[in-house]
C-alpha cells in the first residue's frame, strides 16, 4: 500500500514528522517498507510564464523565449521544446539552479544567443512522465515566481506499507487514517459521502445467481458523460504518488475511490451492455478478452460479471475489453460489489495475472462500503465529466454476520503484563472504530464490517497492545524456581539420536511432507494417499506415508552435483488414515546410504556398501533394544535384500536395498540402501541393569550344519537359541559355504557358540551335553552336523 503524507493529512493530521510516523506505524504492526520524497532533490526552479517566442536565427529547432520568472524583469532563455508557446506556465530553472543528478544551470550561449536558464520537462525534474513531448505545462493559475517544489508539493513524503493479509482495512487512505487517529489521538475526518442528485430515470438491472459468492452488487447509470474530460491535476498527483498511472478520467475515478476508501470499482460502457448485469459462476470453456489484452479460458470455479450475452469481467480480478469505457463513451454504469474472499483467492495465480482489486478482494473488503463507493464515484464523475445520475440498483446475496467479542480487563492485564486503565482501553477501542459497550468484566464489541480479523478476545488484546505501544510495556524478567526436566530411564533423549547418526557419517536433511503421488505408489504401494485440497504444485499433491521418496530425491540432487558417496537421514512425520478413517501422523527416522562403504584411501580396498553395512548402522541405532531382522517383501525394496525390523514381536521398521526396477525409473547408477523406523521405538530403551563380568574364561564351540538352501539361517539360530540355557552367552553365524563336497541345493552354515559360567570354570562334562542338545534340535529342524 503506497500513499502520500499530504493525502493522509486530509483525513488524519498528526503533529508528527514523516520519520516519527514511520516508526509509529511500524511498531503498531503496519510495517513501513520505504519512505521517500515525491521528487528527487533539486533547487532553484520556479513557476514562470512564457511571454514571447521567436525562432532562433541560426537553428531551426530552437526558439528564443522571454520569460517572466518573478525576478522583476524578463529572462531570455533558448528552448528546444516543441510545445513552447506564449502564455503557458512552466517550471523554469534559473542560473545557480541545481537539477537532479547534480546538473548545474549556468548562463550560456546557444548558437550565439545568450540563454539564462532552462525551461523544464517532467523528466528533467525527476517527476513521473506526464506523456507530453516537451515542457511540463502548469495550470493557468500557477503563481509566477513560486518555488516549484512548494507549488507542486514535491517535498511530500511517500509511504510504502507492507500490509499483512489480516489487515485489508488498511489498504486505503481511510483505513490508514483511522489507524493514525487511534495511535496519535488526532481527529479522524474521513471523506464526507454526498448523496448524488438524481437526474436520470435510467437504471441498470442487476442479479446475483451465486449468492454464496457475492453478498452485495450495486449499479448506477450516469448518462451523457464527457469521457474525454481531463483528470484534474490533484487527482493525477494522488494516483501517481500511490503508484497508479493515470489513464482517463473515468478509469482514474474508479482507482481513486478504491485508494481513498478501499472499495474496488468497475466502470462499464452502458451502451455495450445487453440486459441485466448478472453475477454467476463461469461456464467451463467460456472465454473472456481482458483489459490487459489477454484472452483467458474460464473454469467453473471462477466468478464472473456477465450480461445476457456472456461474461463481461472476471469478478474481483479484471474487467473485460468488450464493455470497457473509451473516449467515445457517452453513458456509463458504475458497479461496486462485495465478493466472498474465498472465491477470489488463487484466481490471480490460476489465470496468470492480478490487479489492485484482486489484492483487496482476496483479503476482504468492507461489506457495507459499496453504496458509499457508488455515491463517492458519482460525485466525482458529475464534477469532472458531467452527466446525469440515475438511482442505484442493489441485489443482495449472503453477507457475513457481525461477531460479538468480549474483552475482560483482567485477562488483558494477564496477557500484556501491564495495567491499562479502563478509560484508556475504551478510548483506544473507540478510535479503532470498534464501538465498545461496557460490561461487568470489561467491554463487549461488535466487530465492524471492515474488521474481518476481530474474532476472539485475543484479537482485541492484540489491538490494545499495539495501540498502547509494545515499547511502553515495561521489562519484567521472569523469575521462579529452576528445575531440571526429568527424562525417564526408558527413554533416550532426542539429541542422542541425531548425534548417533552424525557419528555414523550421516547428514540430516529436511524434505517436504507434500510429495508426488507416484512416489506413494512406487515406494509404499499406497493407492489412496491423503490428498491436499490446494496443493502448492502438481508434484506436491499428496501427504507422504513414507520418507523414502524424499530421500531418493535428495540423492538425485546430490548425484547431479557429482557427489558419489551420500549418506543422509531425516526425522519427520508421515501421514495416513487409521482404521476409523481419521488422519494419523507418526514420526519416523529414515536413512539412505549410497556409494562406497568407506571414503577412498590407500589402506582400504574400495567396495560399495551393501545390506550388511546399513544393517549394522540400524543395529547401532537400536543398540538399547533387542531387535530381530526378519526377511520380508516391501514395494520399495529388493525382494532378496529386505528385512523387517522386529522388537517384542512388533514390526517397528524396515531396512534393505532399493528395488532394481526403481533404479532406471529414477535414473540411479546403482542401488542405494535405505531404512525407516518408528521414532518412538528408537527413543525407547530398556532399563540398564548391572551384571558382573565373569572371572572365568569363556568356552567357544564351532558347529557347521549342512542345510537346504531354502532354509533361512535365522530359523536355525532361532531353534538353537530356544534350546540354550543360561550358560550360552552368544550364538551367531560366522561363515556360509557353498560348493565342492556338498550335495546340490545344500549349504554349510558355521555357527559359533560362546559359553561362560559366572561361578565356575566350564569343563567338557558341563559343555558337551549342552552342545549335543543344540545339535539335536538343529537336526530336528532339518540341519545336520557336517562331518
Swiss-Prot record:
Its cofactor is Mg(2+). It catalyses: tRNA(Phe) + L-phenylalanine + ATP = L-phenylalanyl-tRNA(Phe) + AMP + diphosphate + H(+). Binds 2 magnesium ions per tetramer. Its main location: cytoplasm. InterPro entries: aa-tRNA-synth_II/BPL/LPL (IPR045864), B3/B4_tRNA-bd (IPR005146), DNA-bd_dom_put_sf (IPR009061), Fdx_antiC-bd (IPR005121), Fdx_antiC-bd_sf (IPR036690), NA-bd_OB-fold (IPR012340), Phe-tRNA-ligase_IIc_bsu (IPR045060), Phe-tRNA-ligase_IIc_bsu_bact (IPR004532). GO terms for cellular component: phenylalanine-tRNA ligase complex. Residues 39-149 form the tRNA-binding domain. GO terms for biological process: phenylalanyl-tRNA aminoacylation. Its EC number is 6.1.1.20. Pfam families: B3_4, B5, FDX-ACB, tRNA_bind, tRNA_synthFbeta. Keywords: Aminoacyl-tRNA synthetase, ATP-binding, Cytoplasm, Ligase, Magnesium, Metal-binding, Nucleotide-binding, Protein biosynthesis, RNA-binding, tRNA-binding. It is found in: Cytoplasm. Residues 694-786 form the FDX-ACB domain. Residues 400-475 form the B5 domain. One of its GO terms (molecular function) is tRNA binding. Mg(2+) binds at residues 453, 459, 462-463. It comes from the Bacteria. Gene3D superfamilies: 3.30.56.10, Bira Bifunctional Protein, Domain 2, Ferrodoxin-fold anticodon-binding domain, Nucleic acid-binding proteins, Phenylalanyl-trna Synthetase, Chain B, domain 3. Belongs to the phenylalanyl-tRNA synthetase beta subunit family. Type 1 subfamily. Tetramer of two alpha and two beta subunits. This is Phenylalanine--tRNA ligase beta subunit. It comes from Neisseria gonorrhoeae (strain ATCC 700825 / FA 1090).
Amino acid at each position: 500500500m503506497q500513499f502520500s503524507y499530504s493525502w493522509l493529512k486530509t483525513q488524519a493530521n498528526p503533529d508528527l514528522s514523516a520519520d516519527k510516523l514511520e516508526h509509529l506505524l511500524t511498531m503498531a504492526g503496519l510495517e513501513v517498507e520505504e519512505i521517500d520524497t515525491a521528487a528527487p532533490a533539486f533547487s532553484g526552479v520556479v513557476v514562470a510564464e512564457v511571454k514571447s517566442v521567436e525562432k532562433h536565427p541560426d537553428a531551426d529547432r530552437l526558439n528564443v523565449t522571454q520569460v517572466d520568472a518573478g525576478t522583476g524583469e524578463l529572462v531570455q532563455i533558448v528552448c528546444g521544446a516543441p510545445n513552447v508557446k506564449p502564455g503557458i506556465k512552466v517550471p523554469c530553472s534559473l542560473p545557480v539552479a541545481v537539477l537532479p543528478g547534480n546538473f548545474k544551470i549556468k548562463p550560456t550561449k546557444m548558437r550565439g544567443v545568450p540563454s539564462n536558464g532552462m525551461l523544464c520537462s517532467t523528466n528533467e525534474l525527476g517527476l513521473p512522465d506526464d506523456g507530453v513531448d516537451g515542457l511540463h505545462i502548469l495550470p493557468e493559475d500557477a503563481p509566477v515566481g513560486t518555488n516549484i517544489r512548494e507549488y507542486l508539493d514535491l517535498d511530500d513524503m511517500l509511504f510504502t506499507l507492507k500490509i499483512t493479509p489480516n489487515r485489508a482495512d488498511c489498504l486505503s487512505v481511510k483505513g490508514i487514517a483511522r489507524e493514525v487517529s487511534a495511535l496519535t489521538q488526532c481527529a479522524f475526518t474521513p471523506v464526507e459521502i454526498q448523496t448524488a442528485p438524481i437526474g436520470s430515470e435510467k437504471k441498470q438491472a442487476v442479479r446475483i445467481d451465486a449468492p454464496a459468492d457475492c453478498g452485495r452488487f450495486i449499479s448506477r447509470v450516469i448518462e451523457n458523460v464527457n469521457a474525454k474530460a481531463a483528470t484534474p491535476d490533484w487527482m493525477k498527483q494522488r494516483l501517481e504518488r500511490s503508484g497508479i498511472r493515470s489513464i482517463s478520467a473515468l478509469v482514474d475515478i474508479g482507482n481513486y475511490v478504491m485508494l481513498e476508501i478501499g472499495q474496488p470499482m468497475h466502470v462499464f460502457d452502458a451502451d455495450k451492455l445487453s440486459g441485466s448485469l448478472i453475477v454467476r459462476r463461469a461456464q467451463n470453456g467460456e472465454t473472456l478478452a481482458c483489459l490487459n489484452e489477454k484472452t483467458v479460458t474460464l473454469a467453473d470455479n471462477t466468478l464472473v460479471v456477465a450480461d445476457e450475452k456472456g461474461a463481461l469481467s472476471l469478478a474481483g480480478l479484471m474487467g473485460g475489453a468488450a464493455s470497457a469505457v473509451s473516449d467515445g463513451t457517452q453513458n456509463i454504469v458504475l458497479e461496486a460489489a462485495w465478493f466472498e474472499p474465498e472465491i477470489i483467492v488463487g484466481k490471480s495465480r490460476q489465470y496468470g495475472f492480478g490487479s489492485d482489486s484482486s489484492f483487496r478482494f482476496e483479503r476482504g473488503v468492507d461489506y457495507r462500503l459499496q453504496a458509499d463507493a457508488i455515491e463517492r464515484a458519482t460525485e466525482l464523475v458529475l464534477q469532472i465529466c458531467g452527466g446525469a445520475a440515475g438511482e442505484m440498483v442493489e441485489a443482495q446475496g449472503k453477507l457475513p454476520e457481525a461477531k460479538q467479542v468480549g474483552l475482560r480487563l483482567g485477562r488483558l492485564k494477564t496477557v500484556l503484563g501491564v495495567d491499562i486503565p479502563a478509560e484508556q482501553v475504551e478510548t483506544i477501542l473507540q478510535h479503532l472504530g470498534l464501538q465498545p459497550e461496557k460490561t461487568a468484566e470489561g467491554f463487549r464489541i461488535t466487530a465492524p464490517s471492515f474488521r474481518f480479523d476481530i474474532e476472539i478476545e485475543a484479537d482485541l488484546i492484540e489491538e490494545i497492545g499495539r495501540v498502547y505501544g509494545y515499547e511502553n510495556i515495561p521489562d519484567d524478567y521472569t523469575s521462579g524456581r529452576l528445575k531440571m526436566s526429568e527424562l525417564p530411564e526408558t527413554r533416550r533423549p532426542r539429541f542422542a539420536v541425531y548425534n548417533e547418526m552424525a557419528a555414523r557419517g550421516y547428514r540430516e536433511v529436511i524434505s517436504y511432507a507434500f510429495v508426488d503421488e507416484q512416489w506413494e505408489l512406487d515406494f509404499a504401494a499406497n493407492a489412496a494417499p491423503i490428498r491436499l485440497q490446494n496443493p502448492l504444485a502438481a508434484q506436491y499433491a499428496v501427504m507422504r506415508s513414507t520418507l523414502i521418496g524424499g530421500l531418493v530425491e535428495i540423492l538425485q540432487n546430490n548425484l547431479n552435483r557429482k557427489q558419489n558417496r551420500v549418506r543422509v537421514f531425516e526425522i519427520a512425520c508421515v501421514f495416513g488414515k487409521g482404521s476409523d478413517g481419521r488422519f494419523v501422523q507418526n514420526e519416523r527416522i529414515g536413512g539412505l546410504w549410497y556409494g562406497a562403504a568407506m571414503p577412498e584411501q590407500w589402506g582400504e580396498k574400495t567396495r560399495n556398501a551393501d545390506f550388511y553395512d546399513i544393517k549394522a548402522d540400524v543395529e547401532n541405532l537400536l543398540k538399547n533394544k533387542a531387535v530381530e531382522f526378519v526377511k520380508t517383501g516391501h514395494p520399495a525394496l529388493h525382494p532378496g535384500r529386505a528385512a523387517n525390523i522386529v522388537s517384542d514381536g512388533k514390526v517397528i521398521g524396515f531396512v534393505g536395498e532399493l528395488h532394481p526396477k526403481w533404479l532406471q525409473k529414477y535414473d540411479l547408477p546403482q542401488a542405494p540402501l535405505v531404512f525407516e523406523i518408528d521414532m518412538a521405538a528408537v527413543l525407547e530403551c530398556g532399563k540398564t541393569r548391572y551384571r558382573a563380568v565373569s572371572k572365568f574364561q569363556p568356552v567357544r564351540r564351532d558347529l557347521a550344519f549342512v542345510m537346504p538352501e531354502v532354509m533361512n539361517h535365522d530359523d536355525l539360530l532361532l531353534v538353537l537359541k530356544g534350546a540354550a540355557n543360561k550358560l550360552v552367552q552368544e550364538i551367531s553365524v560366522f561363515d556360509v559355504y557353498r560348493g565342492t563336497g556338498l550335495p546340490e541345493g545344500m549349504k554349510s552354515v558355521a555357527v559359533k557358540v560362546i559359553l561362560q559360567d559366572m561361578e565356575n570354570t566350564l569343563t567338557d562334562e558341563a559343555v558337551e551335553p549342552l552342545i549335543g542338545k543344540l545339535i539335536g534340535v538343529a537336526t530336528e529342524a532339518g540341519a545336520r552336523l557336517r562331518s
